[in-house]
Amino acid sequence: IVGGRPARPHAWPFMASLQRRGGHFCGATLIMGWGQLGTNRPLPSVLQELNVTVVTAGICFGDSGGPLVCNGL
């Protein structure tokens, strides 16, 4: 976004950041699960609350200089 400004956390709950290797590469908008938008019903503030553990593992981008060993070979 050009000329944008930082948003408060949770201010835009329908926006998503797709990330790869620890950095943002694409934005997304969540559009499913909001029910029937053509009615006069209020939109839910939370679609679904889920508590999960997310693990991000490091990636090796190079060789440490030592010999490569796999199963003792």
From Swiss-Prot:
Active-site positions on this chain: 64 (charge relay system)
Chain ranges of the Peptidase S1 domain: 1-73
PROSITE patterns, sorted: TRYPSIN_SER (PS00135)
Enzyme class: hydrolase
Gene Ontology MF: a single term: serine-type endopeptidase activity
GO biological process, one term: proteolysis
Alphabetical keyword list: Hydrolase, Protease, Serine protease
Keyword Hydrolase: yes
Protein name per UniProt: Neutrophil elastase 2B
Originating organism: Equus caballus
